């Protein structure tokens, strides 16, 4: 079984993991509500692509 000959230094470890990071979420301006929101999601007011697709005061029951 292979065993490392030397301890991996902090610099070597961190440079190897340099590409592992979180991506910035894709946000865009919603003209109907005047706020920024995630792309391809319904706004809290119930709008998607400028159309009302859901009522904001309607709650779903997950029973």
UniProtKB/Swiss-Prot annotation:
Residues 1-23, 42-63 are annotated as: Disordered. Keywords: Ribonucleoprotein, Ribosomal protein. Residues 54-63 have a biased composition (Polar residues). One of its GO terms (molecular function) is structural constituent of ribosome. One of its GO terms (cellular component) is large ribosomal subunit. Pfam families: Ribosomal_L32p. The keyword Ligase does not apply. InterPro entries: Ribosomal_bL32 (IPR002677), Ribosomal_bL32_bact (IPR044957), Ribosomal_zn-bd (IPR011332). Residues 7-20 have a biased composition (Basic residues). GO terms for biological process: translation. The keyword Lipid metabolism does not apply. PANTHER family: 50S RIBOSOMAL PROTEIN L32, LARGE RIBOSOMAL SUBUNIT PROTEIN BL32. HAMAP family: Ribosomal_bL32. NCBIfam families: rpmF_bact. Belongs to the bacterial ribosomal protein bL32 family. This is Large ribosomal subunit protein bL32.
């Amino acid at each position: 079984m292979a065993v490392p000959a030397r301890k991996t230094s902090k610099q070597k470890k961190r440079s190897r993991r340099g590409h592992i990071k979180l991506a910035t979420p894709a946000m865009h301006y919603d003209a109907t509500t005047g706020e920024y929101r995630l792309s391809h999601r319904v706004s809290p007011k119930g709008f998607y692509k400028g159309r009302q697709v859901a009522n904001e005061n309607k709650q779903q029951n997950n029973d």
